[in-house]
Amino acid sequence: RKESSAASDVYKRQLCEQCKITYIGPDSKVISALGNKSVARNTMVEAGVPVIPGSKEPVYTVEEGEKIAGEIGYPIIVKAALGGGGKGMRVAQTPDEFQTSFQTAQKEAQMAFGDGTMYLEHFVEHPRHIEFQILADKYGNVVHLGERDCSIQRNHQKMIEESPSEALTPELRQKMGEAAVKAAKAAHYTNAGTIEVLLEKSGAFYFMEMN
């Protein structure tokens, strides 16, 4: 059985804890929670960090997904809950496309991560992909070190990173930076990390994931 990178990281962290070795990075519970995109999303919702409209619980079947997709509104993006690297993702522009998109994404997720748990989000058309670098210590202090614009991608894989982003005004940069810090604190994150955000032309932005 293939393990997701998140599961592998949790196992290594737990081994260090058992052997009383100091691990540079967040503890195993944090890695486990953030490695599951659905759990991470719900954590941000509870903390008041803006997220894209989507499923509140994991989705396992086409039938479940079709009902939730109808409530969210099309277009829909289907994502692997334990995914990463652009794998296990498909877009359904209409209800007619949903079954094929879901099954294809789920099969890819099962092969890549050993887990077919999915979640759904409303698909944001032509957003910018912005990442904020954060540093957090074990005492609850968190700072961000500015942003990178990772919008130039191919098949959901980043090709060029630009810093600072020309799309951000000073006011928007401050607002997004504060949200990134809030997200890290909500997850009880420690060490260096990255908050990934989608930014619309309107200036609205949404938490996507943290790693």
Where are these regions (language model features)?
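Single conserved hydrophobic/aromatic residue that forms the stacking wall/gate
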Residues: R1-A7, Y11
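Hydrophobic (often cysteine-bearing) scaffold residues that line and stabilize catalytic clefts
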Residues: E3, N36, A40, L172, ...
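A glycine- and small-aliphatic-rich helix-loop capping segment at beta-alpha/alpha-beta transitions
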Residues: K12-Y23, T94-Q99
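A conserved helix-loop-beta module that forms one wall/lid of the active-site cleft
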Residues: E17-A81, G88
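Internal nucleotide-binding/catalytic subdomain
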Residues: V59, G70-L82, M89-N211
